[in-house]
Amino acid sequence: MHSPPYLLSPAPNTPFPPAEYALREPNGLLAIGGDLTPQRLLAAYRNGIFPWFTEGQPPLWWSPDPRTVFRSDSIHLSRRFRRNLRTSTWTVRADTMFAAVIDACASTPRRGQDGTWITANMREAYLTLHQHSYAHSVEVFDGTMLVGGIYGVALGRMFFGESMFSTRNGASKIALASLAHFLHTHSAPLIDAQVENQHLLNLGAERWPRKDFLAYVRRLITQTDLPACWSVLFGEQLSRELV
């Protein structure tokens, strides 16, 4: 067997190598190539692997160790933030503006990054997953204006977060907390947050050994899928209901 990173064939049914074979440096790089078909993307998530690359690069596939994870019942919102929420008139919905959420995530500047990893091909791939009820978004509104959101992929009782954004202070926190509450209510205990940063850790993210994360993924993806009709189940919630 070749040393990592492994070169994937263009055939979408080509299996991924085990995530445990990923490089230590750069942390988690496992494979290069392949494509972004729904079949390939879903196979990646089922094996604890995600795509992350920039314009001009071939698809790069990652499974870092440790893995950053949220428990859906343990999102941390500060006391001050919760106090401010009590007077908030913002509302939260799901799956009503998926394309707008992914576009806003793509256009949001990120510290230490030039450009965006959400390429045109990546965008189209996740729109296809959304059309097949695998990818979902949670959106925060100030009146009719979209001010924050998060999107990712749901398989079984596992949610794989991809990106979030806010144009108003705290809107992405509300999106994350609303997503977590929804998942916890539907017996989905984990949100994959992929790679750590201080902002995520401040919100309650934990660093798990990859082997523990993979064990949870293997168990949770075999459970009954979350309901597909997120927009109906979510309805329109007031953000202050999170307090």
UniProtKB/Swiss-Prot annotation:
Pfam entry (one): Leu_Phe_trans
Keyword Cytoplasm: yes
Secretion signal, residue range per the UniProt entry: none
GO CC term, one of those recorded: cytoplasm
Zinc recorded as keyword: no
Gene3D superfamilies: Leucyl/phenylalanyl-tRNA-protein transferase, C-terminal domain, Leucyl/phenylalanyl-tRNA-protein transferase, N-terminal domain
Cystine connections: none
Principal cellular location given in the protein's record: cytoplasm
Annotated localization: Cytoplasm
Molecular function as annotated in GO: leucyl-tRNA--protein transferase activity
Keywords on record: Acyltransferase, Cytoplasm, Transferase
A GO BP annotation: protein catabolic process
Catalytic activity entry: N-terminal L-lysyl-[protein] + L-leucyl-tRNA(Leu) = N-terminal L-leucyl-L-lysyl-[protein] + tRNA(Leu) + H(+); N-terminal L-arginyl-[protein] + L-leucyl-tRNA(Leu) = N-terminal L-leucyl-L-arginyl-[protein] + tRNA(Leu) + H(+); L-phenylalanyl-tRNA(Phe) + an N-terminal L-alpha-aminoacyl-[protein] = an N-terminal L-phenylalanyl-L-alpha-aminoacyl-[protein] + tRNA(Phe)
Functional description taken from the UniProt entry: Functions in the N-end rule pathway of protein degradation where it conjugates Leu, Phe and, less efficiently, Met from aminoacyl-tRNAs to the N-termini of proteins containing an N-terminal arginine or lysine.
NCBIfam families: aat
UniProt protein name: Leucyl/phenylalanyl-tRNA--protein transferase
